[in-house]
């Protein structure tokens, strides 16, 4: 009997490890936090989270995935004039993103910083930053300064912490992974 129980335990552990190695994201962790606006679309079999703040410009964070445990995208969004550059000061570290090509290729009327393997260190730092100050430089040369603070920052950090706790980079859909190279071309990052 002990051998049978040991065998069942071993099989359960192997199945659990295989399931986890497959890169499955449990989006239901967001249901536990009533401050997080989790939208579930049973028709499209998808989930999404949007966190927005408006100071000098609309700034938001978005994450989207599928109900079967995949992540499609996560990123910061800045709406307004097309921006050539985004500088984000996280505590004492400056991250600079050249977003000029997004204006040409995507014509968003703003810009976005997408979570990719190249920008993962930025989003990990954002998940624990005490201060987040942002400067957008528009195509016309205007600087727009804003910050993410208070409950907005706490909500973004909660989502990022959950994403990284579940090894988000191994949970992306194939289409999501396919966009990484393009995203990195449209948002080259430097760190000072």
Descriptions of predicted regions:
Residues 1-4:
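Positively charged n-region of N-terminal signal peptides that target proteins for export
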Residues 21-192:
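A generic "folded-domain core" signal
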């Amino acid at each position: 009997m002990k051998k049978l129980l040991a065998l069942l335990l071993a099989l359960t552990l192997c199945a659990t490890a295989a399931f986890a190695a497959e890169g499955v994201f449990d989006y239901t962790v967001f249901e536990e936090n009533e401050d997080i606006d989790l939208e579930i679309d049973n028709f499209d079999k998808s989930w999404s989270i949007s966190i927005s703040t408006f100071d000098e410009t609309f700034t938001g964070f978005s994450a989207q995935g599928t109900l079967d445990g995949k992540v499609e995208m996560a990123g910061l969004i800045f709406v307004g004039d097309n921006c050539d550059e985004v500088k984000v000061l996280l505590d004492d570290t400056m991250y600079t993103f050249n977003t000029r090509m997004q204006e040409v290729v995507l014509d968003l009327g703003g810009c976005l910083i997408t979570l990719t393997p190249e920008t993962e260190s930025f989003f990990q730092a954002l998940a624990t930053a005490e201060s987040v100050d942002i400067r957008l430089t528009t195509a016309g040369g205007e600087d727009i300064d804003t910050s993410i603070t208070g409950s907005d920052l706490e909500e973004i950090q909660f989502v990022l912490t959950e994403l990284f706790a579940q090894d988000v980079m191994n949970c992306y859909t194939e289409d999501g992974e396919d966009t990484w190279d393009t995203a990195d071309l449209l948002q080259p990052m430097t760190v000072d």
